[in-house]
UniProtKB/Swiss-Prot annotation:
This is NAD(P)H dehydrogenase [quinone] 1. FAD binds at H12, F18, N19, Q67, L104, Q105, W106, F107, T148, T149, G150, G151, Y156, R201. The lineage of its organism: Eukaryota, Metazoa, Chordata, Craniata, Vertebrata. It comes from Pongo abelii. One of its GO terms (cellular component) is nucleus. Its EC number is 1.6.5.2. One of its GO terms (biological process) is innate immune response. The keyword Disulfide bond does not apply. Its cofactor is FAD. There is a cross-link at K250, K251 (Glycyl lysine isopeptide (Lys-Gly) (interchain with G-Cter in SUMO2)). Belongs to the NAD(P)H dehydrogenase (quinone) family.
Length: 274
């Protein structure tokens, strides 16, 4: 789509990797459709993933009792965050779509990407308790995870030894991305890439490029709207009583995280509602 901007965040150290090939395919496909594409190749940038006092360039509010969340929020408001954090925040602000390309490591994101989230998604910039989830600062933006795994798809199935991929994705897609407001699109899952032959890899890359041609028009994944909850500390941010009563006799819960003690909706974190 002409006029749109995309940010691709890559978390893989090797240019010969399939993750790098997926990133390159995304750049080519989006540019072909008129997108402006910016990259954050975290390993190539030697991005520092460790939060510390060095993230604040100005005077600390309480150096004797340093608390990173409070100090980083103040530094953001006063313009005293370190330049590398500010640079990434500017990329995010300009982006309509953010693609995260990485290998699944220990059932989560690589450490360097986790550090990127921790340092860049500063309070007041990426979230507040008054504006989170579908009311979050990034609510007009879309995000998609493009993940490779070592294990096969069956290993991440309901009966698989690793357990349901939907459960693995929830902390990332809901706890990080949607928490900050992102409309999260269906993840691009590439299973068992180390055991995938060359011809099949080419097909995967072509399928990814094909999907990206119309990715802006895709339906986001479903997350329980914040309007279903009492959004204040006195009420405990709990689901409203009338909503609980309404959902009581339904077969499935609302989502992976809001299962309400019932069966999880099938592929809640993998497929958008039709």
């Amino acid at each position: 789509m002409v006029g749109r901007r995309a940010l691709i965040v890559l978390a893989h150290s090797e240019r010969t990797s399939f993750n790098y090939a997926m990133k390159e395919a995304a750049v080519a496909a989006l540019k072909k459709k008129g997108w402006e594409v910016v990259e954050s190749d975290l390993y190539a940038m030697n991005f520092n993933p460790i939060i510390s006092r060095k993230d604040i360039t100005g005077k600390l509010k309480d150096p004797e009792n340093f608390q990173y969340p409070a100090e980083s929020v103040l530094a953001y408001k006063e313009g005293h965050l370190s330049p590398d954090i500010v640079a990434e925040q500017k990329k995010l602000e300009a982006a309509d779509l953010v693609i995260f390309q990485f290998p699944l490591q220990w059932f989560g994101v690589p450490a360097i990407l986790k550090g990127w989230f921790e340092r860049v998604f500063v309070g007041e910039f990426a979230y507040t308790y008054a504006a989170m989830y579908d009311k979050g600062p990034f609510r007009s933006k879309k995000a998609v995870l493009s993940i490779t795994t070592g294990g096969s798809g069956s290993m991440y199935s309901l009966q698989g030894i690793h357990g349901d991929m939907n459960v693995i994705l929830w902390p990332i897609q809901s706890g990080i991305l949607h928490f900050c407001g992102f409309q999260v699109l269906e993840p691009q899952l590439t299973y068992s890439i180390g055991h995938t032959p060359a011809d099949a890899r080419i097909q995967i890359l072509e399928g990814w490029k094909k999907r990206l041609e119309n990715i802006w028009d895709e339906t986001p994944l479903y997350f329980a709207p914040s309007s279903l909850f009492d959004l204040n500390f006195q009420a405990g941010f709990l689901m409203k009583k009338e909503v609980q009563d309404e959902e009581k006799n339904k077969k499935f819960g609302l989502s992976v995280g809001h299962h309400l003690g019932k069966s999880i909706p099938t592929d809640n974190q993998i497929k958008a509602r039709k």
